[in-house]
Every structure is written in structure tokens, then in C-alpha cells.
Amino acid sequence: MKTPRLPIAIQQAVMRRLRENLAQANLKLDRHYPEPKLVYTQRGTSAGTAWLESYEIRLNPVLLLENIDTFIAEVVPHELAHLLVWKHFGRKAPHGKEWKWMMESVLGVPARRTHQFALQSVRRNTFPYHCQCQQHQLTVRRHNRVVRGEAVYRCVHCGEPLVAG
């Protein structure tokens, strides 16, 4: 799928939110953390990722276009919080107590680990599997691991191995 072009107004809104959150964090933490690089190359069902060593935030342009206001209000500070935790505390659990504190106490945003965006436009083909209690849909990657004998996936409810079909 081709990456969509983001209107400049949306890119500016994202950058404005990033800068506001960063200024707020620098003020509350009495630091001068630099502005991270912002790119729109995230693919798949992830809304964004924070790359620590390159100090970069990658955002999903498809999900951004489909959920502009919520995306900017939630995903941008979420990913920035990962970078700020890394700068402030060192390497910590991705959604641990330091990240939660950074989100809620420093940035003033509810600490949610996952987004609730509709994924139809970014979801790839899935394969039907089942266990004793329900149907499951495995991604292409997981399905291929099962086919190659590299993985066995189990139902989180009944614990039974998932079977194709």
C-alpha cells in the first residue's frame, strides 16, 4: 500500500503538539531535552513507535489521516513520553511506572498503552484458526511461523493450541 501524502496543516498540528508537550516536560523536569526527529513511516497497525538511539518518533500516516484529533492528542505525547523516559531515567520498561508518571504527571495525558483506532484500512490478510472455545484470526506473519513449525500459538482463554481452519 502506498504511503498517503499528509497535508502540511496536519504535519504542522503534529509538530505543534510535539513542541508543546516537549516544552511542558522541559519546564516540569527542569531540563532542555532536544526536539526528536519526526517521520511518517510507521506501517501496519501500530500508530507510532519511539526509536531511542536515533531519538526519533515514527508515526503511521494512514491512522493519522483517519483519526486526526485523537491521534495528535494521544499518540504524539505517548511516543514522546518513551523518549523522555529514556533520556530522564535510562532504559526502562516500555509502559512501566516511569512512562505512566511521564504521561500523567508531566504531560497531563491519560496513560493508555494501546490505541482504539479502526484498523480495517491498515490490517493485512488474516488466517482463520480455532481452539476449543472460539475463532481466532492470525496475521500472515504468525500463520507463516505456524506453517514452518517455528511457533505454536495458544488461546489466552482456554490455553489450547490454535488449529488452522
From Swiss-Prot:
Main location: cytoplasm
Gene Ontology CC terms, in alphabetical order: cytoplasm
Cofactor note as given: Binds 1 zinc ion.
Domain (SprT-like): residue spans on this chain: 22-163
Cytoplasm in keyword set: yes
Protein name: Protein SprT
Keyword presence, Phosphoprotein: no
Organism of origin: Salmonella typhimurium (strain LT2 / SGSC1412 / ATCC 700720)
Domain of life: Bacteria
NCBIfam families in UniProt: PRK04860.1
BP-aspect Gene Ontology terms: response to stress
Annotated keywords: Cytoplasm, Metal-binding, Zinc
PROSITE patterns membership: ZINC_PROTEASE
InterPro entries: SprT-like_domain, SprT_Zn_ribbon, Uncharacterised_SprT
Record localization: Cytoplasm
